[in-house]
Amino acid sequence: MQDSGMQVLFQGNNLLRILQGLGVTIGISILSVLLSMIFGTVMGIIMTSHSRVIRFLTRFYLEFIRIMPQLVLLFIVYFGLARNFNINISGETSAIIVFTLWGTAEMGDLVRGAITSLPKHQFESGQALGLTKVQLYYHIIIPQVLRRLLPQAINLVTRMIKTTSLVVLIGVVEVTKVGQQIIDSNRLTIPTASFWIYGTILVLYFAVCFPISKLSTHLEKNWRN
């Protein structure tokens, strides 16, 4: 006699495993975003340089990362580095590297846009006070830029959480991979397991991403007001 499909969620520690997999997904996303904010802020400042060479290099990096699918980058980092350079790198580390490269490009362009949108007198006032360029950015420019960027940075978290489903293809045991394992082990006894497992994963993604998306919208409205 076949079991009810919904029972697969409560067999053994299946539900706990799914939640632990979700934790891996969120962990990769948050760490990648934090690194992206740091490197992206630096890159955004560099992108405002008057040097044509620097602007060309940063723009090339930005367009290259945007054009290249994240899945291809994951394969290059995880399989390419391991085989060609004998580097032992885990799937989680590969994912963080790739998502940080992607996030840095996205964040860098946002920082560049935020800096160039600031009124020119902000820079002139700092220079008139005798501030060095480092002091000008540290005390005046970056605080304003970060405030403007916070909603976009939070929105980037949701995009990364959803994109992390790709890391299942390099063996990372995140929420989608856990779901596949549970489905495979119950394929014969519970044919409808895939519906309940993937349905649960969908609900979990929504439960995580929706509040983050609303927070981003709320902060953006407050900033505009």
Predicted segments, located by residue:
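Transmembrane alpha-helices and adjacent helix-loop boundaries
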Residues: 1-225
